[in-house]
């Protein structure tokens, strides 16, 4: 049995020793030449500076009311409870200035940083328009704050999802995907 395994490993090493062929160039539907590297953008490097991200949809441009409404519909179809939270620009991201890392007052929350809840969770919410009106009210009250919509599952007793629904007008943290890579 050992001799059989050795023979297989020898065959594998001979296959690996073959010289690499140049990447296969193919034409896409539009007639442009593509290679493996351009298909998966595998040669790009993530920009580590000024590339802040929030939660689920933070890589996308700001969501429209229609897109938010579709997400809220999905939340309500799954019987999850929507809830709005907001935070000032300087408190929205985890950092040494606004997080207590260790000590007697440190909680067991993921980064020991909380956003302020807007009113109470919307337990009786049945329509996306109710959530959109609360987003507008929160935006009117705190125009310079980040506002996110989170949803909770009462059965599993966990937060299911969270995404930004409002960025402050002065925010410069969003970048196009092409600008996030070098």
Curated annotation (Swiss-Prot):
- Family in the record: Belongs to the RuBisCO small chain family.
Gene behind this protein: RBCS3
A Gene Ontology molecular-function term? Answer: ribulose-bisphosphate carboxylase activity
Official protein name in the record? Ribulose bisphosphate carboxylase small subunit, chloroplastic 3
Xref: HAMAP family: RuBisCO_S_bact
Q: Which GO terms describe its biological process?
A: photorespiration; reductive pentose-phosphate cycle
Source domain of life is Eukaryota
Please describe what this protein does: RuBisCO catalyzes two reactions: the carboxylation of D-ribulose 1,5-bisphosphate, the primary event in carbon dioxide fixation, as well as the oxidative fragmentation of the pentose substrate. Both reactions occur simultaneously and in competition at the same active site. Although the small subunit is not catalytic it is essential for maximal activity.
Compartment(s): Plastid, Chloroplast
Other information: The basic functional RuBisCO is composed of a large chain homodimer in a 'head-to-tail' conformation. In form I RuBisCO this homodimer is arranged in a barrel-like tetramer with the small subunits forming a tetrameric 'cap' on each end of the 'barrel'.
The record's note on quaternary structure and interaction partners says: Heterohexadecamer of 8 large and 8 small subunits.
Q: Where are the transmembrane segments?
A: none
Alphabetized SMART domains for the sequence: RuBisCO_small (SM00961)
Q: Which InterPro entries match?
A: RuBisCO_ssu, RuBisCO_ssu_dom, RuBisCO_ssu_sf
A single Gene Ontology CC annotation of this entry is: chloroplast
Q: Where is the transit peptide?
A: 1-41
Sorted alphabetically, which keywords does the UniProt record give? Calvin cycle, Carbon dioxide fixation, Chloroplast, Photorespiration, Photosynthesis, Plastid, Transit peptide
* Pfam families cross-referenced by the UniProt entry: RuBisCO_small (PF00101)
